[in-house]
Amino acid sequence: MKKAGILNRHLAGALAELGHGHGVLVCDAGMPIPVGPRVVDLAFRAGVPSFAEVLDGLLDELVVEGATAAREVREANPGATALLQTRFPALELVPHEELKSLSANARLIVRTGEARPYANVLLRCGVFF
């Protein structure tokens, strides 16, 4: 049995398949999920697991070279804004509708139980060398 890191077998397997440039959308429970990308739905109930918990767990496992979020997060969700700006100083902000369009090209979507608005970020995978 695995003793550390991400224990969810579906998520761990999906992460192992990612390569340079692939997109990973980490989203709240309300984000529309497009048809096409692989989805790992971790939502259990409202707020569980949180966006922050899932994002930090993923950042422990992934090399990220870029991140994009909806600009609406700045006014609608100060907590998520602070979290994203701390984790990604070069965070790119786009209109929410554009983020939804970009998510259709993600390789993986990880849905959380987050129940605060605009707690979504599209990560672009980097390489460790």
Swiss-Prot record:
Catalyzes the interconversion of beta-pyran and beta-furan forms of D-ribose. It holds the Pfam family RbsD_FucU. Substrate binds at residues 28, 96, 118-120. This is D-ribose pyranase. The active site is at 20 (proton donor). The lineage of its organism: Bacteria, Bacillati, Actinomycetota, Actinomycetes, Kitasatosporales. Its main location: cytoplasm. Pathway: Carbohydrate metabolism; D-ribose degradation; D-ribose 5-phosphate from beta-D-ribopyranose: step 1/2. GO terms for biological process: D-ribose catabolic process. Homodecamer. It is an enzyme of class 5 (isomerase). PANTHER family: D-RIBOSE PYRANASE. The gene is rbsD. HAMAP family: D_rib_pyranase (MF_01661). The keyword Cytoplasm applies. Belongs to the RbsD / FucU family. RbsD subfamily. It catalyses: beta-D-ribopyranose = beta-D-ribofuranose. Its EC number is 5.4.99.62. One of its GO terms (cellular component) is cytosol. It is found in: Cytoplasm. The keyword Cytoplasm applies. It comes from the Bacteria. Keywords: Carbohydrate metabolism, Cytoplasm, Isomerase. GO terms for molecular function: D-ribose pyranase activity; intramolecular lyase activity; monosaccharide binding.
